[in-house]
A protein has these predicted regions:
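Secretory/extracellular carbohydrate-interaction modules
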Residues: 70-169
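Short, aromatic/His-centered strand-loop micro-motif at the edge of beta-sheets
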Residues: 169-196
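Short tryptophan-centered beta-strand motifs in secreted/extracellular beta-sheet-rich domains
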Residues: 33, 122-124, 187-208
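Sec/Tat signal peptide C-region and signal peptidase I cleavage site
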Residues: 22-26
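Flexible glycan-contacting loops in extracellular carbohydrate-active proteins
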Residues: 216-264
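Beta-strand-rich interaction surfaces with strong enrichment in secreted/lumenal proteins
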Residues: 98, 107-115, 179-187, 240-241, ...
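Bacterial N-terminal signal peptides that target proteins for export
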Residues: 1-13, 17-20
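Extracellular glycan-recognition surfaces and repeat-rich motifs
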Residues: 40-92
Length: 272
């Protein structure tokens, strides 16, 4: 075989590998806040619940969830959630209307530029500012039109990372550290910390500041309840679509009650 033919074959093979890699890895979606207006609600996110505004942190524009302001204005959260849900999904949804009454204690903001996330990574930097009842910062994902969702969050008061599911108006933990395994976690609230979710089919992994904290397989059978009692029926995958693979839904930011946190560098890296 001639050398030129060998080179041609090698180039074709390399091109095929490159094309394959391109097909597997889609373009990253990096949230750019540079054109957002400080003091206003973010344009790139749809605040479904809670008080979300653009703030200034040194040289950077950031997203701020103001838990104190939200706590003081809990008279209209359901109406706000329904109005914003109609913007995203186009129609009224009776299931969402029922669920909206239940998730008023969880401020959430949905990213507008990602219609559906199934595989890949989602990462964000967060800084905890304050909170009397809670100090939570999280990545929202698998958001369904009926208001069901999954979230991975760091709680600055418990010093742990937990994966939660929200279904039929009720939030339950899918996996959390055991009492004897509570993490030390980052105590320095003046610094930014990195939270990263990796989704590979049914496999979920959560990293905090570069250290893996949780691994979970969607569709897994739940552990028995306390004292060997049967598990909650909603934690059985056959009864609960949001905990069955594959992941498929919108993504965003999550908080809880009176938590006040800052977020920046939100990046979605899809993988097909």
């Amino acid at each position: 075989m001639r050398l030129t033919n060998i080179r041609t074959i090698a180039l074709v093979a390399a091109a095929g590998v490159a094309a394959s890699m391109t097909a597997v890895r889609a373009a990253d979606v990096k949230v750019d806040l540079s054109k957002e207006t400080v003091g206003k609600a973010p344009v790139v996110f749809e605040p479904m619940m809670g008080m979300w505004v653009v703030a200034q942190d040194g040289p950077d524009k950031v997203i701020k969830v103001d838990g104190q302001a939200f706590k003081a204005a809990l008279d209209t959260p359901t109406r706000l959630a329904l109005e914003n849900a109609r913007k995203m999904y186009g129609t009224s949804n009776e299931e969402l209307m029922d669920n909206a009454k239940q998730f008023t204690t969880f401020p959430i903001a949905v990213l507008k530029t990602v219609d559906n996330f199934s595989n890949g990574t989602i990462s964000v930097k967060f800084k905890t500012i304050s909170g009397d009842a809670d100090r939570c910062s999280g990545i929202l994902f698998n958001v369904k039109p009926n208001g069901d969702w999954l979230v991975v969050r760091y709680n600055d008061t418990e010093h742990n990372v937990v994966l939660w599911e929200f279904h039929n108006g009720v939030r339950r933990p899918l996996i959390r550290p055991r009492d004897g395994d509570l993490l030390t976690g980052p105590d320095d609230r003046a610094k930014w910390h990195d939270l990263k979710l990796t989704v590979d089919g049914a496999n979920l992994q959560v990293d905090l500041d570069g250290t893996t904290q949780l691994k979970y397989v969607l569709g897994s059978d739940p552990a028995p309840g306390r004292n060997g009692a049967p598990p909650n029926a909603d934690l059985i995958p056959a009864n609960n679509p949001v905990i069955r693979p594959p992941v498929s839904g919108k993504v965003g930011l999550w908080s809880k009650t009176d938590s006040t946190s800052l977020f920046k560098d939100y990046v979605v890296s899809p993988k097909q």
